[in-house]
Amino acid sequence: MILEQYGITSFFKEQKIAATSSYGRVTAVFRDYYRVITENEEFLASLKRGNFYELSSTSLPTVGDFVEISGDLQILSVLERKTVFSRMNKDSAEQLIAANFDYALIVMSLNHDFNLNRLERYLTVAWDSGATPIIILTKADLVEDLSFYAQQLEAVAYGVPAYYVDNLSHHGFEALESDLKPNSTLILLGSSGVGKSSFINSLAGTDLMKTAGIREDDSKGKHTTTHREMHLLSNGWIVIDTPGMREFGVGFNQAGLETTFSDVEELAEGCRFHDCSHTQEPNCAVQAALEDGTLTMQHYENWLKLQREMAYHARKNSPALARQERDRWKVIQKSMRTHFKTRPKK
């Protein structure tokens, strides 16, 4: 069955649709149309007028969604999602990127793109999506000593598998492919030019995606993916490619943040006060870890930054939280200024 190759499972087939309708999966999103594949054909579909009028933008179809298709090839409804990846735009509105993927592959290159702060941000949204995160480090052939990067990953990516790959020699792909479940859906996340298109070609074993070279002046790749699209590989995996995202806003669900920064969250449980701001309160376990070097300042400050960003989006979407959050962060900021002024220099 075609849809089984495209990842449909009993979770979706058990969701009831009309007898005259059929199941489909969205393989690409364009401005006014969606490319959908069913058991019989692949086509461009539009939304059924009126069915989505009063729904929020997050209820609209996105790449990876399983949908109900009418006899005249219109999308009637979106089936319940298992996983979903979204980001917050500049207006604090949630923007859907993709849905129903099993693995979130965070692709970074071992050149100027390698950035732990960005990695922590990607890990936060990956955990929050409900999928299993995997770190892919491309251009491993350019690095003589990988231990430097391995040590940095250990500091922020707790228990997340990392694979060092070379798209030219195919080094590292055998280990990755043996760990991926067959017929699973993968989403690729990463900045422009990190080698996502080349990675897909290596995974597919053919030149499926257009690629571009690296600019010699800054080691940055050229952007090649312009829209979200799904690809069925001959080896059975389904890959969702996304345009490069160097910066994006995280939402206001704490689950992903708590998993990414599980070490800080565990430390916070040892604080004397349950409402500790982790800046200068007595018997603060987080500050104690900073003092003895157990917790790095970079990791701690990134945690605070993402906490504040989530609080910002939360109060933008829930005005009742605005005053409470402003008052809370005024106290935190004042405490931080006092703490860092009085903290002895090492």
From Swiss-Prot:
For this protein, the record's InterPro entries field holds: G_CP_dom (IPR030378), P-loop_NTPase (IPR027417), Ribosome_biogen_GTPase_RsgA (IPR004881), RsgA_GTPase_dom (IPR010914)
| GO molecular function, a single term | metal ion binding
* Cofactors, names only: Zn(2+)
Where does the source fall among the domains of life?
Bacteria
Is Zinc one of the keywords UniProt gives this record? yes
E.C. number: 3.6.1.-
One Pfam family linked to the record? RsgA_GTPase
Keywords carried by this UniProt record: Cytoplasm, GTP-binding, Hydrolase, Metal-binding, Nucleotide-binding, Ribosome biogenesis, RNA-binding, rRNA-binding, Zinc
What does the function comment of this entry state?
One of several proteins that assist in the late maturation steps of the functional core of the 30S ribosomal subunit. Helps release RbfA from mature subunits. May play a role in the assembly of ribosomal proteins into the subunit. Circularly permuted GTPase that catalyzes slow GTP hydrolysis, GTPase activity is stimulated by the 30S ribosomal subunit.
Report the family membership: Belongs to the TRAFAC class YlqF/YawG GTPase family. RsgA subfamily.
Q: How does it assemble?
A: Monomer. Associates with 30S ribosomal subunit, binds 16S rRNA.
The protein in question is named Small ribosomal subunit biogenesis GTPase RsgA 1
Q: Which organism is it from?
A: Listeria monocytogenes serovar 1/2a (strain ATCC BAA-679 / EGD-e)
Q: Which gene encodes it?
A: rsgA1
